[in-house]
Amino acid sequence: VPLIIWGCAVPAKDEEVLKKICETCEGENLIIGPVEEKNHKGIGAAAMGYGHTIISSSPIDVNLAKQVNILLENLGVSLDKVIVDPTTGGLGYGLEYSYSVMERLTQAAMTQGDDKLQNPMINNLGNEVWKCKEAKLTIENAPELGDPERRAILMEAVGAVSYMLAGSRILMMRHPESIKLAKAFISLLADGGSAMDVAPITKRLDDVEIDFASMAPAADLTIVEEKKKAVKVASLKEED
């Protein structure tokens, strides 16, 4: 089973710690990341020298993703030992942006034959989902968002399915129920069947009751007749 060592995304600190890990675990072929443009020399050289795989990370941009791979290759790292982290967004605008960039990376690699982008992609989804406030809001603070436990699990599961469809090959997830739902989706794609047969989320917290009807605004059933627009008639002037 491959072991992924993920840093704290502070380039200077990651370089210091991950270099030491590369040395200590020589020959174990760990997956080391995130490696950014700011620290690619130190971590890249250590990973290459001690036989590890690198996660090249860039901030949701096709050109920057390619640039980091080029820098690593110039350093002497084989692109066969590189996994691309395009940077992962949670649900909402962040997910759509990441999804779009991943599609463009795939298109550049497959249709344009760009050999600097023909690498598997990884998404650190759990980190992004579980740190956002929507995943942590209680029923008292946000009753309109529904059951807090199911909400956060579904946020991670929906993100996982979306990134798989965008071409992700490795998903870093946290909640067992989210992982179960993602695996069920893979099985449905591979073997067919109905999503109705997928086991529901197993709750570990107390169930909650939410009266959504009481939160809905009063229905306005007033029918207002639309005013007809006045027809402008242009006056024709006869020329002498």
Predicted features, each with a name:
Residues 1-4, 22-27, 104-123, 190-205:
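Alpha-helix-loop-beta-strand connector modules within alpha/beta enzyme cores
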Residues 1-63:
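Active-site beta->alpha loop and helix N-cap motifs at the rims of alpha/beta catalytic domains
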Residues 14, 61, 80, 85, ...:
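Acidic-enriched, low-complexity/disordered segments with a strong bias for Aspartate over Glutamate
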Residues 22, 29, 71-74, 207-215:
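Short N-terminal secondary-structure initiator segments
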Residues 38-185:
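Catalytic alpha/beta core domains of metabolic enzymes, predominantly
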Residues 179, 183-240:
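Extended, intrinsically disordered, low-complexity segments
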